[in-house]
Structure formats: structure tokens, C-alpha cells
């Protein structure tokens, strides 16, 4: 029995070493399957990355619009009248177009005068140049009133 006992501890020692080596290999091998498991998780991360892109798309969807302000003005002028989403979209694009025209004209005026900043004076002049007749006069008076209110507050 003594030889058997010697064989068992001797067998256990290499067996212990082998399981340790196997455990190390299994740990490495275990990491590989974990990495393989992470690949689908990576795919999930990619899909969550797409979700981030979708989040970015949502951020792009939250582009500033004038819809709230158009609606407020509509309710001031005609409290009982609503507006369709298509009409609201048209009004929003109209205001964006006017804004771009005024900004472009103001930038040209600043360049002509060799000034690095666009001031209220350039804006006022560009309003007079871009908008026709009475509309320009009303816009200038409302703009002046708004600037005065802003500076006094």
C-alpha cells in the first residue's frame, strides 16, 4: 500500500501541476471564449453604438426650430386658429431662409467695412436691404425695440 500511497501523491503532484497548468490554459482558453462571448457583446455594443448614432440622430433631430415661437405668435394674433404640421414646417423653413439671407448680407457688410464683428447696425442695414418697403420699416422698429429692451434689462 505504501507504493500506492507514493504513487497517488506523486500522481497528485503532477495532477495538481497539470490542473494548475490546465487551469492556466483554461483561464487563457476561458478568456478566449469570454472574448468570443464579448464579440456578440461587441456586436451589442456596435448596436448600442448604432444606438449612440441613433442618439446622435436624435440630437440632430433636436435641431433648433422656430416652431414654438411661430405658435406663440399665432396665438397672439389669432388665438382660435391652429396650424398644421406641414404649414409649420413651411413657416420654419421660411424663417430659416430669411435668417440665412440676413446673416449673409450682414457678413458682407462687415467685410466691406473691414470689421470683424457683426453689430446691430449691420443687422439693421441688412434688414433694410433684404426686406421690402413697409416690412423693412416694421422689422427695424421691432428690432430696435427688442435691442432696447434687452440692454435695459
UniProtKB/Swiss-Prot annotation:
Query: Which location does the Swiss-Prot or TrEMBL entry give for the cross-link Glycyl lysine isopeptide (Lys-Gly) (interchain with G-Cter in ubiquitin)?
Result: 149
Where in or outside the cell it occurs: the entry states:
Nucleus; Chromosome
Q: Give the CC-aspect GO terms.
A: nucleosome; nucleus
Ranges annotated as biased composition (Basic and acidic residues)? 1-28, 36-53
Q: Which UniProt keywords apply?
A: Acetylation, Chromosome, DNA-binding, Isopeptide bond, Nucleosome core, Nucleus, Ubl conjugation
Please give the chief subcellular localization of this protein: nucleus
Q: How is it modified after translation?
A: Can be acetylated to form H2BK6ac and H2BK33ac. Monoubiquitinated by BRE1 to form H2BK143ub1 and deubiquitinated by UBP26. Required for heterochromatic histone H3 di- and trimethylation at H3K4me. May give a specific tag for epigenetic transcriptional activation.
- Which Pfam families has this protein been placed in? Histone
N6-acetyllysine modification sites are 7, 37
- The UniProt annotation puts the region (Disordered) at 1-61
Q: Does the keyword DNA-binding apply?
A: yes
Question: Can you provide one Gene Ontology molecular function annotated for this UniProt record?
Answer: structural constituent of chromatin
The UniProt entry's sequence similarity note says: Belongs to the histone H2B family.
State its role. Answer: Core component of nucleosome. Nucleosomes wrap and compact DNA into chromatin, limiting DNA accessibility to the cellular machineries which require DNA as a template. Histones thereby play a central role in transcription regulation, DNA repair, DNA replication and chromosomal stability. DNA accessibility is regulated via a complex set of post-translational modifications of histones, also called histone code, and nucleosome remodeling.
Record text on subunit structure and interactions: The nucleosome is a histone octamer containing two molecules each of H2A, H2B, H3 and H4 assembled in one H3-H4 heterotetramer and two H2A-H2B heterodimers. The octamer wraps approximately 147 bp of DNA.
Protein name, entry field? Histone H2B.10
Amino acid at each position: 500500500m505504501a507504493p500506492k500511497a507514493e504513487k497517488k501523491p506523486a500522481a497528485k503532484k503532477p495532477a495538481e501541476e497539470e490542473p494548475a497548468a490546465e487551469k492556466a490554459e483554461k483561464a487563457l482558453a476561458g478568456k478566449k471564449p469570454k472574448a468570443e462571448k464579448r464579440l456578440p457583446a461587441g456586436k451589442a455594443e456596435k448596436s448600442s453604438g448604432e444606438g449612440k448614432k441613433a442618439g446622435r440622430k436624435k440630437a440632430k433631430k433636436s435641431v433648433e426650430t422656430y416652431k414654438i415661437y411661430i405658435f406663440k405668435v399665432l396665438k397672439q394674433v389669432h388665438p382660435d386658429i391652429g396650424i398644421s404640421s406641414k404649414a409649420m414646417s413651411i413657416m420654419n423653413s421660411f424663417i430659416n431662409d430669411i435668417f440665412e439671407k440676413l446673416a449673409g448680407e450682414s457678413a458682407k457688410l462687415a467685410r466691406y467695412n473691414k470689421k470683424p464683428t457683426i453689430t446691430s447696425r449691420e443687422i439693421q442695414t441688412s434688414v433694410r436691404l433684404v426686406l421690402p418697403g413697409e416690412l423693412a420699416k416694421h422689422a427695424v422698429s421691432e428690432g430696435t425695440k427688442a435691442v432696447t429692451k434687452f440692454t435695459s434689462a
